[in-house]
Design a protein with these regions (language model features):
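Conserved, carboxylate-rich catalytic/transport cores that coordinate ions
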Residues: 3-266
């Protein structure tokens, strides 16, 4: 008789395990974009559902022209109506382009840009009422870009804490949670001093608690002095890196503005 030996074991972090993304509906449309980058490991979060809304919004802000967005939406819609035997994979890509076109159209209405011209210069009651309702000037668009950058960075840190908890255990996420407390409390104190005054008792409680978590649990397996040293180093990286990361979101505003200028020239 022949004998067969087999062994069943959980994969180790070093194993190269095949990855199958499992998203539904709206989020599945963004899987091709996710595949352009590194796929998550089997024991990591699939970030597709979390980056999809941001990608859609940022695409619209970068293109920032309601005329281009309307053209994308209508062109793909007409193609889907007249084309025959469209592959399933192509259908999802076409739907994604329609969504990105709709996002571009909506974001273009924030500035009134349509093929390089300003819709809100047209003295028609509909456009003027739309201008009063949703129009943003350059300074407001600049501020919106910075706010969106701050929101996405903090949201990314929350996902990082969740990922650390899944992979290594909660204690490895404590330092990240501490930095989240520091940043969120500072943002609230800056934006809404009436709710939480900057340097007030409530703000200081969150600040001290967050820094203690960040300094004492930076690397839970090491001693307290190493943790404090690593925490100080992280403070430097946080101060310099965070400023650069948030300012990089100004490119959303700059790309939309430059696109409108180029369209008006040509």
């Amino acid at each position: 008789t022949e004998e067969v030996y087999y062994e069943i074991s959980d994969p180790s972090p070093e194993d190269d395990v095949p990855i199958l993304l499992n998203n539904k509906g709206f989020f599945r449309l963004f899987e091709p974009i996710m595949r352009l980058y590194m796929l998550p490991k089997y024991n990591e979060l699939d970030l597709t559902p979390f980056f999809a809304p941001f990608f859609m919004l940022f695409f619209g802000l970068c293109l920032g022209d309601s005329g281009y967005g309307l053209f994308m939406l209508l062109a793909v819609t007409v193609y889907r109506l007249v084309a025959k035997n469209i592959a399933a994979s192509m259908k999802s890509i076409l739907t994604l382009v329609q969504l990105l076109g709709a996002s571009t159209m909506v974001c273009g209405l924030l500035t009134g840009t349509c093929f390089g011209f300003n819709l809100y210069d047209i003295q028609v009651p509909f456009f003027q009422s739309l201008k009063e309702a949703i129009s943003l000037d350059n300074q407001q668009m600049f501020n919106l870009s910075l706010i969106l950058g701050g929101v996405q960075i903090i949201f990314g840190m929350i996902l990082k804490a969740v990922n650390q908890t899944i992979q290594f255990g909660f204690k490895y996420a404590v330092a990240t949670i501490g930095w989240i407390l520091v940043l969120v409390s500072a943002a609230i104190a800056f934006a809404a001093p009436g709710v939480m005054p900057m340097g007030g008792t409530v703000h200081l409680v969150f600040l001290v608690a967050g820094l203690l978590m960040a300094y004492l649990y930076n690397s839970p397996d090491k001693n307290i002095f190493v943790n404090i040293g690593l925490g100080l180093w992280d403070s430097y990286n946080m101060a310099t890196g965070l400023l650069g990361d948030i300012l990089s979101y100004v490119r959303l505003f700059a790309l939309g503005l430059s696109g409108g200028i180029l369209a008006s020239v040509f």
